[in-house]
Amino acid sequence: LVLVDFQKEWTNPESDDFLGDIKQLVQRTNKLIDFCRKKGCKIIFTRHVEKDSVDAWSEKSEGTRLLDELHKEKQDVIITKHKISPFYQSKLDKELGDSEKIIVAGILTNMCVRSLIQDAYDRDFEITVIKDCCATYDKKTQEFTFKDLKATREKIEFLNVKEFVKST
């Protein structure tokens, strides 16, 4: 399970990157984390940090920390990334090892989540995207991103948390 950029900056009302109230998103994501953990999945969190930044996305910023509400445990992997793709110059490939399947959720759907999906697809992963555990700034962008990915990468599975739990 790869959880992309569930960071505090998205929940800061003073931030240009504020997504609004994402409590329900976090609750659904915690259900996903708990379910995957019970199934023995490796849990990987990514966090976006801009290398030369001195603002909200800098290493020292509270905004780049993972959300406290997430069900994190000591054995979970946290990968700091510096570009849109979680694969780019990170240890994600190494952490995924010989896995053939990847479950994806995260923020922003149309940016880092999409980039992860595209790069995982090009690496021949079997991909399941948990739609209701992804978020971006507006519904139209969210829907277009999923529609476009479906149209261009037919093998990707798109489910909500309830569907995923039932099918697994």
PLM regions and their residue ranges:
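Active-site-adjacent betaalpha module
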Residues: A56-T168
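Active-site acidic carboxylates
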Residues: L1-V77, K166
